[in-house]
Amino acid sequence: MTRQSTVDQNQSTYNAKNFITKERQESKLDIDQLNVFLENGEQEAKLTHDLIEEIINDPILKTDTDHYDITKSQEREITARRIARLSLYMEHDVKTKQREFKDDLVKNLERKDSKLLTNKDLSIFDRRLSLVANIDPGLSTRIGVHLGLFGNCIKGNGTDEQIHYWLQEKGALLLKGIYGCFAMTELGHGSNVAQLQTTATYDPSSDTFKINTPDLLATKWWIGGAAHSATHTTAYARLIVNGKDYGVKTFVVPLRDEKTLNLLPGIMIGDIGAKMGRDGIDNGWIQFKNVVIPRQFMLQRFTKVIPGSPPKVQTQPLLDQISGYSALLSGRVNMVMDSFRFGSKFAIIATRYAVGRQQFGPEGNETQLIDYPLHQYRVLPQLALCYLVAPTAHKLMGTYISTLMELHQAGADKAKLINVSNKLKDLFIDSASLKATNTWLVAKLIDDLRQTCGGHGYSSYNGFGKGYNDWVVQCTWEGDNNILSLTSAKSIVKKFADISRGKNTTVTTDSLKYLTPQFIGKSLSKDLTFKFDNKKDFTEIWAVMIIRLIHHVVELISKGTKIDSLSKTLVQISKFHAIHSMLLTYQDKLNNESEASVKDAYTKGYLWKLYELFSLYFIDQHLGEFLLLKVVTSDQMSQVLQPRLLQLLPEIRKECIALTDAFKLPDAMINAPIGYYDGDIYHNYFNEVTNNNKLEPDGAGRPPYYPLLTSMLGRDDFQNRLGGSFESETLDSLLK
């Protein structure tokens, strides 16, 4: 509790908002065109705006700064209430997409002859969930685990009949009937899925499986939704038939009674407890003891157990391989979109604060933070990152949806399955690389931008603390970033090696088109130089860097170096692949008049400036590698690249407020008073602090534990506590 302010808040010294008002008045950027560019089209921009308005005006979903003060228990309850609220939107969103409002959607889906809902049918709700994640990531995850992990595991591994039964007849796809979680990770294994220890042993006498947790390390761990809410799980377990281990497969296992939520026989579940962030998620642990499920609860698109004497296991190797690529793609693709939306929020906060905040300089006319060159270097490249990731996020999502559609349409056609398998492999490379790189970059963005806001960035009410704690789990779950980077890089290196040997290698995505004999030869030429007199150079230099890094790795391996000892370089290859992919997608979009939606030349010019800044900033960040592999020379760096970088910063600074406005995020989505639209950082911040920490009637500010303080301050002199008798020698030693 604090004493009420005695300061006149209308004094003219509170002028932070004047700076932002002035910047907006002087801006020449077309905000609407920028927003359409960021949202991937006019209709998409309108949909995003409409959904945001619904979210911030919904009394259950809207989030204020008092959310930063709630306890874990309160957050769990709020999250449950919001899940129930979002379930009401879901049916409406599907009907809106299908343009059918008369029929009872739930009953239609339950019919055995009903068509399976597609990703397109769910696209409006998916967008709603993506936007909700900006203000409540835990809420988005709770539903995302059910729809994205539980649901997509069934979609990816189940037969059409199983998909229809679990997702439509049982109601899961509309958050009805059952609630699912995803039991892959165990206490002893996470990334190494092949070594998971939970078992599913087939019993031919009853045509059932027995699910068991053989030891402590096999306990399912970190399972979102398990602690309190999930009625079912998709469990990853080792298929055991006739004593033979067929590896890890997927099974639907009931956990709780659907009506009472009481645990079923053989199920033991506990709460993981406090975490760094996302306390709205009820992460739990699960142990199984002789849990019996019907054979039909094994997801059988790729592997089947055929009853008989003896029973047989039928596996389609190609399809089983596809299963390995498709299982976790959804989450990784969504995390790239999350990187765009979540990163944008903090770029807005830090940029607006940097414009409104003054520090040092003449009295009464101190310098705005954003006018310091170092501050520009700390803030503006992070803003550029948010612009660069947007087109890539939209493209990756589109590729993911179209590839999964091809997979389901391929049926048993081997040629089509081989084609879609190649696409899934390349999509795995891109999604793994982009997920890892962007979640790392946004984690760094949040903390770096927090520091640019000084002490005020440390306040919970300005969002950085909770934002960081909520975000960094993205660097670990659904594929640890280092493991994903290593895996994607090894796949890229293998493609390079195959091409170098003259082997026919399929490349299905634009981001990997640098893997051609012609470009490899060009990249390894000692005569290659970049003048940076055209836009293409800012992207191509990254492709050359990747080729030279890969060539370096391949040479070392050929001389006997173990590939694991080159892990640091492999992670760099993956990061550089992601940066190149983002630059290439952004460049292609700007060059495509029909896609870019930016007709105003001045506005388009600034999009190009952001493109150049992004490329140059990361070259500067990785200067050692570029110099070591002679992709650039020290003269180029000192005479061309760094001067251009330093030239771009003040140019972009001129329009930085308009560039934040283009995201069109209202204050209720930002939820940080130093980043609100009006720029009145001090009034907004002071008011939020005092509103959330109510004043005592007498303004005394005396805490409930005041006796501890008063007894300490009013304690006796130490002479009295020592009994009033001591030698001067003892006193001297005590006073030293």
UniProtKB/Swiss-Prot annotation:
Functional pathway: Lipid metabolism; peroxisomal fatty acid beta-oxidation
Keywords: FAD, Fatty acid metabolism, Flavoprotein, Lipid metabolism, Oxidoreductase, Peroxisome
Record SUPFAM superfamilies: Acyl-CoA dehydrogenase C-terminal domain-like, Acyl-CoA dehydrogenase NM domain-like
Gene3D superfamilies to which the protein is assigned, alphabetical: Acyl-CoA dehydrogenase/oxidase, N-terminal domain (1.10.540.10), Butyryl-CoA Dehydrogenase, subunit A, domain 2 (2.40.110.10), Butyryl-CoA Dehydrogenase, subunit A, domain 3 (1.20.140.10)
InterPro entries: ACOX_C_alpha1, Acyl-CoA_ox_N, Acyl-CoA_Oxase/DH_mid-dom, Acyl-CoA_Oxase/DH_mid-dom_sf, Acyl-CoA_oxidase, Acyl-CoA_oxidase_C, AcylCo_DH-like_C, AcylCoA_DH/ox_N_sf
Keyword Oxidoreductase: yes
Named cofactor requirement(s): FAD
One GO term (biological process): fatty acid beta-oxidation using acyl-CoA oxidase
GO MF annotations, alphabetized: acyl-CoA oxidase activity; FAD binding; fatty acid binding
Superkingdom per UniProt: Eukaryota
Reaction it catalyzes: a 2,3-saturated acyl-CoA + O2 = a (2E)-enoyl-CoA + H2O2
EC code: 1.3.3.6
Main location: other
GO cellular component terms, semicolon-separated: peroxisome
Protein's UniProt keywords contain Metal-binding: no
Cellular compartment(s): Peroxisome
Family: Belongs to the acyl-CoA oxidase family.
UniProt cross-references to PANTHER family, sorted A to Z: ACYL-COENZYME A OXIDASE-LIKE PROTEIN (PTHR10909:SF352), ELECTRON TRANSPORT OXIDOREDUCTASE (PTHR10909)
Protein name, as recorded: Acyl-coenzyme A oxidase
Protein source organism: Kluyveromyces lactis (strain ATCC 8585 / CBS 2359 / DSM 70799 / NBRC 1267 / NRRL Y-1140 / WM37)
